[in-house]
């Protein structure tokens, strides 16, 4: 359970007192060995029960468990920083060599993958896979880089026999959304969860009785509140947010998991269709 990542990425979901607690913990994570809930409550001018409830909201049994987990996470994080300090920095600069940029990008993508997989609710993922597998029609929505992720997923799902509607034009996305029916599924991909085009499509899909699955960040957002199910992605972008590379890496990791899970549900037939598709493409290449 990555509590530090949860607090950094879900600040918009916190109440005023919860935000005080999160800010304090993030600012003093290196000093938590000497921090008690009593002293913390006194310093923040809140009740001890508020601190316990905050810990439980994050998934811990109580403050003691949360405090010990944060101490451990901080220790591991410091060790990782020491390991990479010789050849890596925190962001890409104009002075970096190509090799240095490659190392930084590689590390950024690895962190995005690790944190996304570590925070994944696998029971929820299994529910989502089962829902998608039974859907008469699957619509995938996204804008910009998220649209590319959606396009990739749509090709994969069509390859194993699913009916998928994935259009880049947001006007067409909205038109498809308002025509969905009960039993259909809309997969909405947006890291911010606040793109008006995607939110509008999600609202239209919900109105028609379709199930909305959001692939989005942990932060509170209109899309997150609208969705029936959320699959969380974690991404710490560098100062040079070149096409949101680590965000797309995190999103692709989730969509690839969805696809492999779908293949696993009906592996023999899915693999047969994948092979048949490859054979047809080979014939096209020969002509």
UniProtKB/Swiss-Prot annotation:
Keyword Mitochondrion applies: no
Residues covered by the SIS domain: 128-268
GO biological process, one term: N-acetylmuramic acid catabolic process
InterPro entries named among the record's database cross-references: Homeodomain-like_sf, HTH_RpiR, RpiR-like, RpiR-like_SIS, SIS_dom, SIS_dom_sf, Tscrpt_reg_HTH_MurR, WH-like_DNA-bd_sf
Pathway as given in its UniProt record: Amino-sugar metabolism; N-acetylmuramate degradation [regulation]
CDD domains attached to this UniProt entry: SIS_RpiR
DNA-binding residues: 37-56
Domain HTH rpiR-type: 1-77
GO molecular-function terms, A-Z: carbohydrate derivative binding; DNA binding; DNA-binding transcription factor activity
Keywords: Carbohydrate metabolism, DNA-binding, Repressor, Transcription, Transcription regulation
Disulfide bond in keyword set: no
Endpoints of the signal sequence: none
NCBIfam families: PRK15482.1
Chain's role: Represses the expression of the murPQ operon involved in the uptake and degradation of N-acetylmuramic acid (MurNAc). Binds to two adjacent inverted repeats within the operator region. MurNAc 6-phosphate, the substrate of MurQ, is the specific inducer that weakens binding of MurR to the operator.
Name of protein: HTH-type transcriptional regulator MurR
Organism: Salmonella arizonae (strain ATCC BAA-731 / CDC346-86 / RSK2980)
